[in-house]
């Protein structure tokens, strides 16, 4: 008991000392915000558990304007609720505001090397060079068009067979695309796949790691030195389990590619091309860059695609008029004798507008990903101190009435040159949905291509409406989960094939893309 009391007293004393030292460093002239309390600062002003943080921080815009601040245990956090502030700080001044905040739980949980957590340094530049070379523009992703063609067609087939398993099918499609592109890994076409299962569980861990305000150790780093048996420190056991899965998610598929490459059985992929281009030594910095940039592709690509597609299906059932107009465009431009392909997308302006509006109406990452300032800066009359965390409220920007007419409504027409927008369509959400400046998502072109093709094909062959139970429509409430990656709350739909010809087109997938033997067995035999 005496030992516990001593530890508590030491912890309290250390926290007070840490706060006192930070208090001396606080610079006058921060952006406005709620008055901080001694020691804890604005800890009690954080969103409560389960709250939608983008709506919580939107209140700051009403109270303080497009830029505001809070301080937690001496750490300054800048809340950005406006396009102009975000563009000025994170685009035009990206040389100053492109780092990432230090997140102790990321290291404890084994995620410190993923793209979203590493600071702006030579390692990040190495990641981005490798990723840009593979998927940095529309031309570089053309080598993946056949994979997108195959997996979106297979998605249609799975939905046709079991429409009630929509989310499972979306995860299978996204996982199959990303794992094939990144590692040359062929997933199980229908059954359980061990690698998809592993990475999905690891990504569930990641969602917990990045939960805003979810880990006190991020505000009081010295808590990491307390033993896991200490009262209130059971989070350390969770972090240890997360670390094991993060390591497995990174090491196992990388080892799979190396083995396949050595046996000359590999399918060309992101990792295999980097292995061929570089003399990569075991345990080297180059190997770390390859392994972790590859791992980052799944988090950035698969999670985004699943969430956006889920939102798309929900919103189509809510807006049948939009669905009908989109189907009329596809029927007129593509016809009924084939599925749309990527070459059609440039001739489908309404489909492209639907994709943009899905991205805008509910951004997949409503609060974006936090930036950090590498040196002190001045914005208008406000001081942005070195080490400040910048949090862009993407949802607020996507619903800014100064940029979007009837911002809460789902209106793809806002992006077309017609009616009130004949001269200037409204602001393209691609300009901010995928991040800012030097931290823009490097896989955005791949994600956009998959969304455009998937949306066009789904609407070409399916009608999406409310589910019916006991003769009555099941209402759909557009509610969303909190967190960095936000998805629609569970909902029910009716997904019916439009006609017999559409059914024939879907079922032709086996002729065009014969099912392949998966790599699940090879993965099971892998020894690392």
Curated annotation (Swiss-Prot):
UniProt-annotated binding residues for heme: 441
UniProt cofactor(s): heme
Cell compartments where the protein resides: Membrane
SUPFAM superfamilies linked to this entry: Cytochrome P450 (SSF48264)
Domain of life: Eukaryota
The entry's keywords: Glycoprotein, Heme, Iron, Membrane, Metal-binding, Monooxygenase, Oxidoreductase, Transmembrane, Transmembrane helix
Glycosylation-annotated residues: 137, 450, 463
Keyword rRNA processing: no
InterPro entries: Cyt_P450, Cyt_P450_CS, Cyt_P450_E_grp-I, Cyt_P450_sf, Cytochrome_P450_fung
CDD domains: CYP64-like
Class in the EC hierarchy, top level: oxidoreductase
Membrane topology (UniProt): Single-pass membrane protein
PANTHER family the record matches: P450, PUTATIVE (EUROFUNG)-RELATED, P450, PUTATIVE (EUROFUNG)-RELATED-RELATED
Function: Cytochrome P450 monooxygenase; part of the gene cluster that mediates the biosynthesis of 2,4'-dihydroxy-3'-methoxypropiophenone. The first step of the pathway is the conversion of acetate into acetyl-CoA by the acyl-CoA ligase ppsA. Acetyl-CoA is then used as a starter unit by the polyketide synthase ppsB and condensed with 4 malonyl-CoA unit to produce the pentaketide backbone. During polyketide extension, the polykedite chain is probably reduced and dehydrated by the KR and PT domains, respectively.
Family per record: Belongs to the cytochrome P450 family.
Name of protein: Cytochrome P450 monooxygenase ppsD
Species of provenance: Aspergillus oryzae (strain ATCC 42149 / RIB 40) (Yellow koji mold)
Name of the encoding gene: ppsD
């Amino acid at each position: 008991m005496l030992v516990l009391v001593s530890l508590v007293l030491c912890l309290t004393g250390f926290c007070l000392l840490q706060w006192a030292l930070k208090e001396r460093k606080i610079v006058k002239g921060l952006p406005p915000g709620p008055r901080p309390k001694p020691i804890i600062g604005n800890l009690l002003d954080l969103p409560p558990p389960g709250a939608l943080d983008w709506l919580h921080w939107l209140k700051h815009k009403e109270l303080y304007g497009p830029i505001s601040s809070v301080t937690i245990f001496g750490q300054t956090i800048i809340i950005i609720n406006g396009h102009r502030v975000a563009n000025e700080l994170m685009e035009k001044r990206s040389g100053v505001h492109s780092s990432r905040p230090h997140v102790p739980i990321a290291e404890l949980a084994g995620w410190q090397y993923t793209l979203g957590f590493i600071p702006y340094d030579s390692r990040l530049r190495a990641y981005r060079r490798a990723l840009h070379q593979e998927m940095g523009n529309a031309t570089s992703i053309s080598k993946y068009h056949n994979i997108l063609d195959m997996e979106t067609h297979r998605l249609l087939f799975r939905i046709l067979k079991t429409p009630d398993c929509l989310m499972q099918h979306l995860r299978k499609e996204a996982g199959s695309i990303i794992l094939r592109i990144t590692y040359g890994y062929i997933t199980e076409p229908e059954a359980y796949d061990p690698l998809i299962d592993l990475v999905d569980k690891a990504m569930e861990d990641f969602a917990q790691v990045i939960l805003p305000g979810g880990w006190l150790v991020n505000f009081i780093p010295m808590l990491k030195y307390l033993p896991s048996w200490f009262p209130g420190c059971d989070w350390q056991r969770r972090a240890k389990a997360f670390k094991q899965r993060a390591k497995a998610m990174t090491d196992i598929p990388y080892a799979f590619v190396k083995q396949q490459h050595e046996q000359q059985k590999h399918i060309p992929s992101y990792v295999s091309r980097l292995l061929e281009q570089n003399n990569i030594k075991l345990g080297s910095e180059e190997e770390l860059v390859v392994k972790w940039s590859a791992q980052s592709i799944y988090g950035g690509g698969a999670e985004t695609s699943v969430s956006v597609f889920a939102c798309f299906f929900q919103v189509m059932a809510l807006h049948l008029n939009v669905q009908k107009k989109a189907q009329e465009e596809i029927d007129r431009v593509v016809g009924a004798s084939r599925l749309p392909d990527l070459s059609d997308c440039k001739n489908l302006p309404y489909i492209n507008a639907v994709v943009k509006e899905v991205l805008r109406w509910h951004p997949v990452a409503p609060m974006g990903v936090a930036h950090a300032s590498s040196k002190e800066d001045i914005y208008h009359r406000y001081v942005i101190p070195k080490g400040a965390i910048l949090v862009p409220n993407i949802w607020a920007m996507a619903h800014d009435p100064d940029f979007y007419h009837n911002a809460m409504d789902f209106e793809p027409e806002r992006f077309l040159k017609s009616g009130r927008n004949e001269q200037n369509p409204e602001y393209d959400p691609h300009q901010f949905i995928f991040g800012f400046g030097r931290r823009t998502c490097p896989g955005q072109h791949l994600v956009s291509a998959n969304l455009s093709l998937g949306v066009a094909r789904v609407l070409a062959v399916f009608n999406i409406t409310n589910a019916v139970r006991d003769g009555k429509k099941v209402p759909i409430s557009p509610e969303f989960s909190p967190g960095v990656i936000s998805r629609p709350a569970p909902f029910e739909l009716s997904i019916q094939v439009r006609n017999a010809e559409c059914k024939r087109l879907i079922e032709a997938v086996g002729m065009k893309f014969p099912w392949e033997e998966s790599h699940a067995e090879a993965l099971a035999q892998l020894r690392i």
